[in-house]
């Protein structure tokens, strides 16, 4: 259920596009950091792939030919680079609102900068752009820096709300680790009781 709800939320936020003048491209919120912070990098990655697939099939946003690039630029960077290099190390010794805000903003800015730079490299490799590489980079990076800051603040607001209401839902924190251990202990206890019942 959480994957479906979060996927729908990210799908809706990605519909907000910002035209980048002179490039033929547009920028938008991604949601990779938000997904990975709540679902973990692997489930978040799969959810993001589902969002991108629905977009290209139903609304022709990106298209099938660009699906692989979009998965790399948004799903991979957001759900693995942001989650494993920034979110998890910062939450290792416990979560707090300050840490959540810092990790959200830093993660979103970094992953969107990586994604924007990858777009310029992919466009250059395709050979269909009329803009020089330096000009394309000079336009893409500042705009995605602003988008990253906005997305970081939105992500932080959502995650701070979750932290207050259900802190165990945050991936990579002490609370989520304790929840996983509790689930494992429960399964272990049930398994032992089942074996004893059969044995008796």
Model-predicted segments: where are they?
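Membrane-helix interface motif
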Residues: 120-129
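Hydrophobic transmembrane alpha-helices
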Residues: 1-35
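Hydrophobic core segments of alpha-helical transmembrane domains in multi-pass membrane transport
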Residues: 9-14, 80-83, 108-120, 155-163, ...
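Hydrophobic transmembrane alpha-helices that form the pore/transport pathway of multi-pass ion
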Residues: 29-43, 47, 97-103
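Alpha-helical transmembrane segments and their cytosolic interface
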Residues: 1, 135-199
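Hydrophobic alpha-helical transmembrane segments
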Residues: 1-5, 45-49, 72, 101-106, ...
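Interfacial aromatic-anchored transmembrane helix boundaries in multi-pass membrane proteins
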Residues: 18-24, 51-80
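Short helix-perturbing small/polar motifs within transmembrane alpha-helices
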Residues: 74-115, 119
